């Protein structure tokens, strides 16, 4: 019984191609997994940008608090309801 080599070579090549396709679509490092990781990276970049902007705002606020008393005075008036000596506070009811 003699094996026809082109037939077996064809079968081996088809099996190798099927194995590679399986890894491409389903296995570790598949296209779906790469797409999910790219989405996670994009989401993380967005979150990082949001946090960087928040940090810039907080840094500016801290610098303003360190440099002047205007901001401290404004926060004391609005958040704590404080008034200066000699001032009278009038609250209007709605």
Swiss-Prot record:
It is found in: Cell inner membrane. It is a single-pass type II membrane protein. Residues 31-78 form a coiled coil. Residues 1-8 are cytoplasmic. It holds the Pfam family DivIC. It comes from the Bacteria. GO terms for biological process: FtsZ-dependent cytokinesis. Residues 27-94 are periplasmic. GO terms for cellular component: cell division site; cell septum; plasma membrane. Its main location: membrane. The chain crosses the membrane at residues 9-26. Keywords: Cell cycle, Cell division, Cell inner membrane, Cell membrane, Coiled coil, Membrane, Transmembrane, Transmembrane helix. The keyword Transcription does not apply. Essential cell division protein. May link together the upstream cell division proteins, which are predominantly cytoplasmic, with the downstream cell division proteins, which are predominantly periplasmic. Part of a complex composed of FtsB, FtsL and FtsQ. PANTHER family: CELL DIVISION PROTEIN FTSB. Belongs to the FtsB family. This is Cell division protein FtsB. It comes from Pseudomonas aeruginosa (strain ATCC 15692 / DSM 22644 / CIP 104116 / JCM 14847 / LMG 12228 / 1C / PRS 101 / PAO1).
């Amino acid at each position: 019984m003699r094996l026809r080599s082109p037939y077996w070579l064809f079968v081996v090549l088809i099996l190798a191609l099927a194995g590679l396709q399986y890894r491409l679509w389903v296995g570790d490092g598949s296209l779906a997994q790469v797409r999910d990781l790219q989405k996670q990276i994009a989401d993380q970049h967005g979150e990082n940008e949001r946090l960087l902007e928040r940090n810039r705002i907080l840094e500016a606020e801290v610098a303003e608090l360190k440099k002047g008393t205007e901001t401290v005075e404004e926060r004391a008036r609005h958040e704590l309801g404080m008034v200066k000596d000699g001032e009278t506070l009038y609250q209007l009811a709605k």
